[in-house]
């Protein structure tokens, strides 16, 4: 993981690249209809990312880089707009900058209303960093505010699993699935629980279900192949 950087530094650096083309200066710009502005940037960015973002040509940045810079600029102009902060947090996390993502998510979660999607990603980062007490506390607090959010229960299950509480993790996965979490993902998590419990046959059954539900999800396939090899099962061609 890359070291954390202050939020102001991260956003200022992104905006500085295009400062010469900004008119009027960002400090004098007003936040106007941020939902529409964000949508006009996110939609083409997601479309380009689905195809694969190409590199820039010479000194020119790529279109993906330009759109990301504009999303970062919007966070400076509209610093209290939670969806824009969330978009920048996701971009930072995907770019392997968890420190920047964490600071953006903390800004969102400091606002008075509930933002479960922000809590899910913040909890995931805490789990990855080994801060299980914080992750559990955050997720439990957010579940009280948004008890019908599948992602909160699923991420809470992950925190419980990593902490060795397999029974409660399974219960949380049952809730997450009932609230709409994808079955293939639930099957993968259940496979982890069965594997940790020493029930390899059950784990392989769940991993097989996860692979069938989402063949592109590599962790399920990798664990299934490893368990089959350990059991002496020849891999399928």
Residue ranges and their predicted role:
Residues 34, 82-83, 115-117, 150-151, ...:
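Helix-start (N-cap) detector for alpha-helical repeat units in TPR-like alpha-solenoids
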Residues 192-195, 218-235:
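TPR/TPR-like alpha-solenoid helical repeat scaffolds
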Residues 59-69, 94-107, 128-141, 163-175, ...:
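Structural signature of tandem alpha-helical TPR/SEL1-like repeats
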Residues 1-20:
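Sec-dependent bacterial lipoprotein signal peptides
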Residues 77, 110-111, 145, 178-179, ...:
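Structural marker of alpha-solenoid helical repeat scaffolds
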Residues 20-83:
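N-terminal leader/linker segments that initiate helical-solenoid repeat arrays
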């Amino acid at each position: 993981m890359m070291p954390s950087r202050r939020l102001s530094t991260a956003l200022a650096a992104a905006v500085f690249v295009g400062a010469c083309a900004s008119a009027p200066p960002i400090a004098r710009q007003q936040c106007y209809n941020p939902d529409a502005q964000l949508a006009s940037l996110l939609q083409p960015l997601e479309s380009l990312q689905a195809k694969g973002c190409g590199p820039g040509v010479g000194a020119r940045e790529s279109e993906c880089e330009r759109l990301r810079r504009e999303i970062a600029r919007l966070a400076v102009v509209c610093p209290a707009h939670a969806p824009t902060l969330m978009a920048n947090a996701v971009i930072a996390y995907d770019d392997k900058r968890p420190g920047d993502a964490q600071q953006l998510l903390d800004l969102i979660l400091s606002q008075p209303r509930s933002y479960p999607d922000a809590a899910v990603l913040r909890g995931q980062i805490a789990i990855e960093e080994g801060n299980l007490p914080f992750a559990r506390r955050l997720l439990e607090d957010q579940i009280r505010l948004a008890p019908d959010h599948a992602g909160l229960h699923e991420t809470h299950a992950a925190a419980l699993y990593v902490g060795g509480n397999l029974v409660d993790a399974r219960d949380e996965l049952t809730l997450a699935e009932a609230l709409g979490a994808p079955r293939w993902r639930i099957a993968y998590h259940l496979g982890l629980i069965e594997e940790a419990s020493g029930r390899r046959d059950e784990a392989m059954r769940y991993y097989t279900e996860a692979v069938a539900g989402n063949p592109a999800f590599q962790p399920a396939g990798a664990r299934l192949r490893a368990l089959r090899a350990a059991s002496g099962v020849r891999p399928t061609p």
